[in-house]
């Protein structure tokens, strides 16, 4: 096998501007190794610039080869040399190349300790602090369990303290023994002899004697005592109930949350009694805890008093016997407690409870839990609700609230009860004057209709005068959805106060300035509405067709039939603006007479409106047998000149039969439940109807004939 191969040396130009159009070329050489088809680029100083594997490629002169980071232009071949091929490394030859380093051959080991180390004579000797456990002792848990006694002997803990260690690990928070750093480790022979001697001396050891060989003893390791919280026992062996499990509302006074453990902080029973300790000794002086009182009654009082008054009895572990010592009587318990009582001069470790953290007693939150009350008044919702229910039950006659904001009757429609009464109003004398239209044109009210999306507007079949008269009422409705029949009614039709007989008769319709307008205090600057007191007093009754009629209080009066007058039926509106039905064949007089804001006056200026009689009754839907009341007033001509009187044709009377009204404005018929919503809705209705009146006036002042043009209807 050849151990050398040819290497071709080429003179090249190279550049690192692979992406640029204008490239800067530099001189260099390229060596092509034929055994692995690798090209290496060198610069003019013989430094490696780039390399590339030219697999299945031939090097051609005057050609460009793209390397990894550069472009090489091959000019000519300079020379050919031979290079030795290095051997291919194999796994079998790894051991022949040399030894592996020590850190790869051996795992990590702790520092070595000589076997000739001195053994200390101190009985409390322990392992040095630099002695570490190996990995084998973590996995070998069974051996460490068997020889736990021997390990305890290696720490200098006698066999008499082993029971106290085991007892403290179950019932108390224990600490690990202090490790003295200068103590040395004892050899295995001394460990075996000490274990055998301790087993012979104390036959009360719960562990069986070790029959294994000395060499089977593992290296002792530091034992960690895990504290386990369990139920404490009283002095006669009965279990005290855990306050966490028996968490009642009546015996929370001895709650362990509210006070620290006074086990290590007080050496006298008097200090324990004074402190608010949630400990076992505190329960002796606490009357709320019944379990500790029963323990005192059943048990021996002498034993309890001895344990309570001895300063170190709370630290002795055997005062709380384990389950294995339950068969012992009280005498044995006293002996064990005296044996296990450590003397203050002894150098043995004193196994005590770890002190619990001092917890501040909560103030203001947990004062009295018996009454289920807290000092914070916002938390006593249950008590407040019970007290409120009791107060409400004691009240027999609960009076209705008479709040102006939440009315109890239809008086909320009174505009005087709203905020408009504090707003200065305009003078109402200008509102009662008739509207002066330009070019002497007649005031023609607009035909209004409620927009119906199901059927077009259809006028009711009636006489020509009836149809024309209803075109001046305000609207002509087609409401098959509401009544099932076509209906024509006034847009100003209102009977809000027909239900309330308690309305004071302060707003009876007057005739001094206008036959159907009541007294008002002016126009509201905020809403633009006329501010009225309460509506007219009336009662509600049914006609033959079931329609509603408003019969005002007072006598019914009418003029003689042969007097020169016209039938004008006045309909009540929310703001008392009248609309008229004039039955006459004279269309010119009709066009002049239908003014919504003022009634027609006589041609002579000397005649006043106040001379017309008072309107007493309005009947909307008369039956066939009952004729409508004839409301006859003098209607003077407004637009005729002062000196001339237009001829008045003899009038004839027609019975106006309206079907059942499609819309009702009664409070009981409105689709609202809340009276507060009704109060705000009524003002919105007033504003909407005022906008309709303004729209009528604006459209008629433009001089448009809106009788024929229905495109200008208000929607």
From Swiss-Prot:
Residues 202-213, 601-614 have a biased composition (Low complexity). Residues 301-326, 472-481 have a biased composition (Polar residues). It holds the Pfam family ZGRF1-like_N. InterPro entries: DNA_Repair_Helicase_ZGRF1, ZGRF1-like_N. Transmembrane segments: none annotated. PANTHER family: PROTEIN ZGRF1, ZINC FINGER GRF-TYPE CONTAINING 1. This is Uncharacterized protein C553.01c. The lineage of its organism: Eukaryota, Fungi, Dikarya, Ascomycota, Taphrinomycotina.
